[in-house]
Amino acid sequence: MTVREGLLHFVLLGILVLLFFVVSDYHDGNWARIMVLAVYAVGYNLLFGYTGLLSLGHALFFATGMYGLALPIQHLGFAPVPAFLSALVCAAVVSSAVGFLALRTSGVAFMIVTLMFAQAGFLLSLYAGRYTRGDEGFVIPQSARIIAGIDFSDPTIRYFAAFFVFAAAYLL
């Protein structure tokens, strides 16, 4: 990375910090969501940009992490930190299994295999609607949004948590 590119990265991050103080609360929430999805895009860029493998099933891993966090909280009564660890384990297991099979292919076959796994995950979440609430989803209880005394339902905390995760992913 050149000095100019590095400077551009930090200017973008500076703009994101300033946006919090300029735009309304509604838009702060939208920007927080955008930064979370940008982390998703950075992961996709790592795969496609460095390996040339075009994955059509990248959302499966995003959903696995989300359900790996939310389901233990909702149905098993996990505290937030063990649920977060559960999400990491679930995402690692699913991505390892899919990667083990998908990386034996390349080109269009890789795209088809990753799409197949993503569709299987999507259908699983729909058919297990009793637990996942299908395409409606569910809301994590307020008590589970407090980690180490920090309330992540607070818009300011949520914005800057999304910002720091995005900044870490973006700068790496």
What are these regions (language model features)?
Residues 1-172:
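Transmembrane alpha-helices and adjacent helix-loop boundaries
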